[in-house]
Structures are given as C-alpha cells and as structure tokens.
C-alpha cells in the first residue's frame, strides 16, 4: 500500500513536524458557541460575539506565550475575527510562529442500532470547506470522534464507523492542504479501571490506523489527538507515573513511528493533573518515536477564564495566568515540569463533564 502523495505532501509533512516541535504544543480554542456559552455562564459573562472575541484576543495576545505554542485550533467564527486594532487573528498567529488550525466536524449524533453510541457529522462538503479554510490561512484541521466504555461498549460497529469517519476526514483534508489531527476520544465516563481503558484505547487506535492505511492517508502529514489512559471518572485516581506507563504502552503498540507527534486532549482532567501526566510520559525511559505534547482547551484556559471574569481591568492578570500554564505544559513536553504551575486553586479543580460535547 502506498500513501497518497498529492501536491501538498511536502507541506503537510513540514507542518505536522513543526506542530510536533518539542517544547511547543497546541491551544485548543475551538469551542462551539454553545460550549463557550457554558464557560461564560460560570463567570457571569454574556455569550455574545464581542465577548468571545475579547477572550480569544486575550489568549492570542498574551505576552511570552508564543514560544510555548506551535498551533491554535480555531472555531470557524474565530478564523475570520480580528484584534481590536484590526489585525486578523490568523495573521497575528502566523507572524509569531503559531500555525492556525480549524475544527471541521459538525458534532456527534446518535449511531442507530447502538446503546447511545455516536458518530461524527461533517463529511458533507468537507472538501469545499477545507479549500476555503486553507485560503483563509488555516494549515491543519481537527475532527473529534467519541467512544464510550460500558458493559458492551464500545461496540464493534461504533469502533469501525468512527475509524472510517476519521480516515475519510483525514484524506479529504490532505487532498486540500490541511494536516488532519485525528481525534478518537475514549471518554472517561464510568467506573472502569485503568486496564479496561488501556485495552479499549489500544483496540480503538488499532482500528483507526487500519482505516487510515486503507484510505492511503500520508501518516507523516498527520497528528494523533488521543485520550490519556486513565481510570474511569467514578474510580479512584492513580499516580501520573501509572497513567504514563499505561498510555505510552498503548501508543507504542498501535501508533506507527511515521506519525510525527501525539497531541493529547485533557479530557476533563484538572489543569495540574493534565500537565503532571504529560510530564510523567515524557520522563518515561522507553523508546518513544513521536513527540508527546498537548492540545489542551479547558486545561489551558480554565484558571485564565476565572482570572479574567469578563473584565478589561483583569486582562493583564489573566494573561499572566495563561502564560504560567503555557510554560508549565511546555516544560512537561520536555519532562521538566516540577509542579505547581499555578498557586491558584483553579488549576487543581476537576474539569470533568459527563458525556462532554465540544
């Protein structure tokens, strides 16, 4: 089997490799309007376009954060927004060495014939949308598939359906110049132990890479965004070193070394937990052929959001909080995080939401 080599092949490989630079990671700022509304409600801020723009501007203009970031995932609205000075966000990011990306899926819907499992929408007109996003400056994309652990879940139907959806998305992106971030998220919901999560994660990833190969996806021009292997949300917590061992083992068994980087989702962990777990993985003394870094949304933004609280006078304080988290995660990609990236209790607060929708 030979991988697809289109006119963008060299660019895709270069972009994916850059995003996976050790010491850098991705800020996921692609929350849908509905999801950002929930975040705003928690700080009593109205969910209107000007407030969403203000938050994104706060994040994208934070002094000192650019060396810690290689990419930012944007929601479609944000791709076309500007700073208050009139500079497009995309331009601002690119000038500072941060690659703009775009969320392209349209959310999940129930998968008929299953026990509440889901499939992801958005393949219709995806090629045309990718062309538009490329013209607007985006160079990578994200698509989230969601799987759950239960007595009989994930079902084979759900695993295959979601793997094929991710593969079709990935090849369409590559044909149109965007590096696909492949995100098969195994939710933490449930009372299962870490061994169960490891087994399911391995099964899911094996199916995903089989589908990517079947669709001739150029693996060197992709990134993987998986869940960390953890016990279920209703089970006792385990140490970061245990999570690191199970997660890296699952990845070593399933993810080809052609993939340049693995950018973890935080999956409702607290900011501090997510950083400590990433750090433990990078400290693990085993062969890891890919960069292990972050693509965090809630785990980069939560304490920043609280510090800001929608008030202009709090912007500098909120940006300092954001810088602290960015630096902590940058250190974690190198296995050099020493803990306590924020003395703020918000950093240790669980961000778990059952059946999380983006």
UniProtKB/Swiss-Prot annotation:
<feature type="modified residue" description="S-glutathionyl cysteine; transient">
    <location>
        <position position="68"/>
    </location>
</feature>
<keyword id="KW-0704">Schiff base</keyword>
<feature type="modified residue" description="S-glutathionyl cysteine; transient; alternate">
    <location>
        <position position="173"/>
    </location>
</feature>
<keyword id="KW-0324">Glycolysis</keyword>
<dbReference type="GO" id="GO:0003729">
    <property type="term" value="F:mRNA binding"/>
</dbReference>
<comment type="pathway">
    <text>Carbohydrate degradation; glycolysis; D-glyceraldehyde 3-phosphate and glycerone phosphate from D-glucose: step 4/4.</text>
</comment>
<dbReference type="GO" id="GO:0004332">
    <property type="term" value="F:fructose-bisphosphate aldolase activity"/>
</dbReference>
<dbReference type="GO" id="GO:0006094">
    <property type="term" value="P:gluconeogenesis"/>
</dbReference>
<keyword id="KW-0007">Acetylation</keyword>
<comment type="subunit">
    <text>Homotetramer. Interacts with TRX3.</text>
</comment>
<dbReference type="InterPro" id="IPR029768">
    <property type="entry name" value="Aldolase_I_AS"/>
</dbReference>
<feature type="binding site">
    <location>
        <position position="298"/>
    </location>
    <ligand>
        <name>substrate</name>
    </ligand>
</feature>
<feature type="active site" description="Schiff-base intermediate with dihydroxyacetone-P">
    <location>
        <position position="225"/>
    </location>
</feature>
<feature type="binding site">
    <location>
        <position position="39"/>
    </location>
    <ligand>
        <name>substrate</name>
    </ligand>
</feature>
<dbReference type="GO" id="GO:0006096">
    <property type="term" value="P:glycolytic process"/>
</dbReference>
<feature type="modified residue" description="S-nitrosocysteine; transient; alternate">
    <location>
        <position position="173"/>
    </location>
</feature>
<feature type="modified residue" description="Phosphoserine">
    <location>
        <position position="350"/>
    </location>
</feature>
<feature type="binding site">
    <location>
        <begin position="266"/>
        <end position="268"/>
    </location>
    <ligand>
        <name>substrate</name>
    </ligand>
</feature>
<keyword id="KW-0597">Phosphoprotein</keyword>
<comment type="function">
    <text>Fructose-bisphosphate aldolase that plays a key role in glycolysis and gluconeogenesis.</text>
</comment>
<dbReference type="GO" id="GO:0005829">
    <property type="term" value="C:cytosol"/>
</dbReference>
<feature type="active site" description="Proton acceptor">
    <location>
        <position position="183"/>
    </location>
</feature>
<dbReference type="InterPro" id="IPR000741">
    <property type="entry name" value="FBA_I"/>
</dbReference>
<dbReference type="InterPro" id="IPR013785">
    <property type="entry name" value="Aldolase_TIM"/>
</dbReference>
<feature type="site" description="Necessary for preference for fructose 1,6-bisphosphate over fructose 1-phosphate">
    <location>
        <position position="358"/>
    </location>
</feature>
<dbReference type="Pfam" id="PF00274">
    <property type="entry name" value="Glycolytic"/>
</dbReference>
<comment type="similarity">
    <text>Belongs to the class I fructose-bisphosphate aldolase family.</text>
</comment>
<protein>
    <recommendedName>
        <fullName>Fructose-bisphosphate aldolase 5, cytosolic</fullName>
        <ecNumber>4.1.2.13</ecNumber>
    </recommendedName>
</protein>
<keyword id="KW-0702">S-nitrosylation</keyword>
<feature type="modified residue" description="N-acetylserine">
    <location>
        <position position="2"/>
    </location>
</feature>
<keyword id="KW-0318">Glutathionylation</keyword>
<keyword id="KW-0456">Lyase</keyword>
<keyword id="KW-0963">Cytoplasm</keyword>
């Amino acid at each position: 089997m030979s991988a697809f080599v289109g006119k963008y092949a060299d660019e895709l490989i270069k972009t994916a490799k850059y995003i996976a630079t050790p010491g850098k990671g991705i800020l996921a700022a692609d929350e849908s309007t509905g999801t950002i509304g929930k975040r705003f409600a928690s700080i009593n801020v109205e969910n209107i376009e000007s407030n969403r723009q203000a938050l994104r501007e706060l994040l994208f203009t934070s002094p000192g954060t650019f060396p810690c970031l290689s990419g930012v995932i944007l929601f479609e609205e944000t791709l076309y927004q500007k700073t208050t000075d009139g500079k497009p966000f995309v331009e601002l990011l690119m000038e500072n060495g941060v690659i703009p990306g775009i969320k392209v899926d349209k959310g999940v819907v129930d998968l008929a014939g299953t026990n509440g499992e889901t499939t992801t929408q958005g393949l219709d007109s995806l090629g045309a949308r990718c062309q538009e996003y490329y013209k607007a400056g985006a160079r990578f994309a994200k698509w989230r598939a969601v799987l759950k652990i239960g007595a009989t879940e994930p079902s084979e139907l759900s695993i295959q359906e979601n793997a094929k959806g991710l593969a079709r998305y990935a090849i369409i992106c590559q044909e149109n110049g965007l590096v696909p971030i492949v995100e098969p998220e195994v939710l933490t919901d449930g009372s299962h132990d870490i061994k169960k999560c490891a087994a399911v994660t391995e099964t899911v990833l094996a199916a995903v890479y089989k589908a990517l190969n079947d669709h001739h996806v150029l693996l060197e021009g992709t990134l993987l965004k998986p869940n960390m292997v953890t016990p279920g949300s209703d089970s006792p917590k385990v140490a970061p070193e245990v999570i690191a061992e199970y997660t890296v083992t699952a990845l070593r068994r399933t993810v080809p070394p052609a993939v340049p980087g693995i950018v973890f989702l935080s999956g409702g962990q607290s900011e501090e937990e997510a950083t400590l777990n990433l750090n433990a993985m990078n400290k693990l003394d085993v062969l890891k052929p890919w960069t292990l870094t972050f693509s965090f949304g809630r785990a980069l933004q939560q304490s920043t959001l609280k510090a800001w609280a929608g008030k202009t006078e709090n912007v500098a304080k909120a940006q300092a909080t954001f810088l602290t988290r960015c630096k902590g995660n940058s250190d974690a990609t190198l296995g050099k995080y020493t803990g306590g990236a924020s003395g703020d209790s918000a950093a240790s607060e669980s961000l778990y939401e059952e059946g999380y929708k983006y």
